[in-house]
Regions:
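Upstream accessory/linker segments immediately N-terminal to the RecA-like ATPase cores of bacterial MutS
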Residues: 1-124
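Conserved SF1/SF2 helicase motif Ia
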Residues: 159-178, 182
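Conserved helicase motor
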Residues: 199-209, 227-232, 357-366, 385-389
Length: 500
């Protein structure tokens, strides 16, 4: 816990002690050198939860100035970061741009190709985003929606409005797999306009890259899907109007700031199921506009989630239950080196199933082939690293098994779980971990949080839990935990008036 005046100590117990002929309750805290502090229960407001893993934690010393010096240092750092943050926001807010002007009739033609009925939340997000494009100020909106709730369709509408207004559109994604999926989707939807859509990734050949860069510069390419390849100084645009950052939690602040500083006049939209604490904090503070898509598509069923120590019998049951109902299984490991272990387990269990393997070290053609086989139902199980976290949508795959789940981040686990349950069939997620003796309390808590949030649309609440577990970190994101560990998240919030 953190005492407002004395700093970080350890809660021991609540004691009943006789004082002046009456019994009172005290909170017993331990500080460095085993010094004890008894806090009257009526002064409970003076302490708060520390909120971080206590491994290697050094308690404060009673009577020392260390705590006050740390608080002062963090306050100064927050003030510096807040000033920088506000300066950047004010700079963009002071820019005047030409509102986008598009044909609603043409946009309606584009919308008709959407195969589903929009939810109310989705329509609201689309309406607000399109309204942003018609303003004289650059947009800066976070669209937070659960996995499979329709964020991509919002991006497609934004892209169409941008294209119809005569501007170029870019969507940047974290993985080549997601880039491939978006490439297929965008080309299909924009085929009615004969729009030039290009994809730029690490698999793009030098010849293709040269042609794409030339097309972006002279305006021949109107829509670009790009991975981290976009963060290069040699990329120039003829008339860039809008940038969408998909899975924004996957990108570093330097990368995002690079694009904004290079193109200060563009509209910016960020898509995320589980926004990083910094982005969520910025939205909660009003520095970004926020749209939440919290309504699931019709007939969607929540995913049953189990957290448990790995046992062969559980592994066997999970696979056979899914295969017996004609479904498919995702098996995910944290490292490529873990894949042989899973293959060996499958052999030990003598399961008569077909499976494929996918990971980032494979060639593009190999990755495409294995995912195409899984998509077409030619193989029953896919063993992979977290490259499936984004960019694969298979309605027949409704069981997810994750090995060493404690090694993944909370948002990673949430994204991975979103690979299943994308139809009206009940889906299951099994988060296997090592013995509870071998993993720390924070990792176990993280897994339990995910299991607790089974309901559809729980991504925003889960991001808030992540905010509490990890802290907001540096407001500008140059350090994910930043100085918050020095004083705890609660005390960081106590200084948030600095931002205003």
């Amino acid at each position: 816990v953190v005492h407002h005046k004395h700093g970080i100590g350890r809660f021991i117990s609540i004691d009943r002690i006789d004082v002046d002929r009456r019994t009172r309750e005290f909170i017993r805290l331990i500080y460095r050198n085993n010094d004890k502090l008894l806090l009257p229960i009526e002064n409970l407001n003076l302490i708060s939860r520390y909120g971080f893993d206590d491994n290697n934690l050094i308690l404060d010393k009673l009577g020392s100035n260390d705590w006050l010096l740390r608080k002062s240092s963090v306050k100064k750092r927050i003030k510096f970061l807040a000033n920088k943050l506000i300066k950047n926001a004010a700079k963009r807010d002071s820019i005047n741009i030409n509102p986008l002007n598009y044909s609603q009739l043409e946009l309606d033609k584009f919308n008709e190709k959407f195969e589903f009925i929009e939810t109310e939340d989705q329509l609201t997000a689309i309406e607000k985003s399109l309204n942003d494009l018609t303003q004289e100020k650059p947009a800066n909106r976070l669209i937070c929606g659960d996995v499979g709730f329709g964020k991509t369709e919002v991006a497609l509408r934004i892209a169409c409005a941008t294209y119809l207004s005569g501007y170029q559109f870019v969507i940047v994604v974290p993985t080549t797999l997601l880039a491939l999926q978006h490439s297929r989707t965008f080309k299909s939807r924009f085929s009615i306009f004969n729009t030039s859509v290009a994809t730029l990734s690490r698999f793009t050949s030098l010849k293709e890259k040269k042609q794409i860069l030339e097309g972006l510069k002279n305006g021949d390419i109107q829509i670009l899907i790009a991975t981290h390849s976009l963060f290069k100084k040699d990329i120039e645009f003829d008339n860039l109007g809008t940038l969408v950052i998909d899975e924004e939690q996957k990108f570093g602040v330097d990368q995002k700031e690079f694009l904004i500083n290079k193109h200060p006049h563009i509209h910016l939209f960020s898509l995320s199921a589980t926004p990083i604490p910094r982005t969520l904090q910025m939205s909660l503070l009003g520095l970004k506009d926020l749209s939440v898509i919290g309504t699931p598509p019709s007939n969607r069923i929540s995913i049953r989630t189990y957290v448990q120590k790995y046992e062969q019998v559980s592994f066997l049951t999970a696979i056979t239950n899914e295969i017996s109902r004609g479904g498919q299984v995702f098996i995910v490991v944290p490292r490529i080196s873990n894949i042989p272990f899973v293959e060996n387990e499958l052999k030990k269990l003598q399961l008569d199933i077909s499976y494929g393997v996918g990971h980032s070290k494979m060639k593009e053609k190999e990755i495409e082939d294995v995912f195409l086989s899984f998509t077409n139902g030619d193989i029953q199980c896919l063993i992979s690293t977290n490259i499936i976290e984004s960019g694969i949508d298979i309605k027949n795959a409704n069981t997810l098994i994750i090995f060493n789940s404690n090694l993944f981040g909370l948002s990673q686990l949430y994204q991975l779980r979103g690979r299943v349950g994308r139809s009206n069939r009940r889906a299951y997620a099994y988060l296997f971990h090592d013995s509870e003796k071998l993993i720390n309390k924070t990792a176990l808590k993280k897994l339990q949080v995910l299991a607790n949030y089974e309901n559809l649309g729980s991504n925003f609440q889960l991001a808030n839990e992540d905010l509490e577990i990890r802290g907001a970190g540096n407001l500008l994101g140059d350090e994910q935990s930043g100085h918050v560990k020095a004083v705890s998240y609660t005390h960081l919030r106590a200084h948030e008036t600095t931002v205003y």
